Amino acid sequence: MRIPKVMSTQHPDNVASPFFSTNVVLSGDDEVLEAFYAYSHLGCDEQMWDCEGKEVDAYVVKKLFTKHEEFFRENVLGRDLRLTLRVPNPEEEKAEAKILLEQLETIPRVFDLSKLFYGEDIAPIFEVILPMAKEADSIDRIYKYYMNYVVGKQNKATKEGDITIAEWIGEFKPATINVIPLFEDLEYMLKAPQILKEYLLDKEVTEQRVFL
């Protein structure tokens, strides 16, 4: 897997509004367009999609594919380019905790959309960023929740003797996701090696990114 070199972190404080924006405050379709320009004009190979502390467009992948089809046919989202969710930390942001669950549920949906678009199994979103990370358990809960509940429910039926959810709705992919801890406080930056060692103890991963 190719590691991205340049990430756009969504609308930093600018001297003036960008040329594509219809409002001073970027939101909705302006954020989708910003992501496209980050990829196509600025040469970024990764866009952070910030779900922390604000409303976010859950249909960003569909809008990118629909409005910029030719670009994303040539630049495969999930292979050449990445779209990475920054999710709320439930331990630190109680009022937004359930937004985390909402965003995890979108990952199999956009996988299905991508399969229709590219004709092969490519996950356009397969990583999430956990801000204010402090311990291995916080990272692991997201990893296990996605694997055991978001994807795991496909093997269950809504009632005894009925078909499984996968037979009813279709398979849920990808089977697992990567969770990127963002260590923001010096104390936890210094503990990052130990925290990651504990988190990875029961996992076989080919890559693990860490943000400081």
Give, region by region, the residue ranges found by the protein language model.
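Short secondary-structure boundary/capping segments
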Residues: 101-102, 143-147, 196-199
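A short acidic (Asp/Glu
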Residues: 94-98, 137-143, 190-195
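Alpha/beta catalytic barrel-like cores
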Residues: 1-137, 148-158
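Conserved, mostly hydrophobic/aromatic
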Residues: 181
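Short mixed-charge
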Residues: 149-174
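Short helix-terminating capping/connector loops at secondary-structure junctions
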Residues: 76-80, 118-124, 167-176, 203-206
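Catalytic or ion-translocation cores adjacent to nucleophile or general acid/base/metal-coordination motifs
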Residues: 171-173, 191-194, 198-212
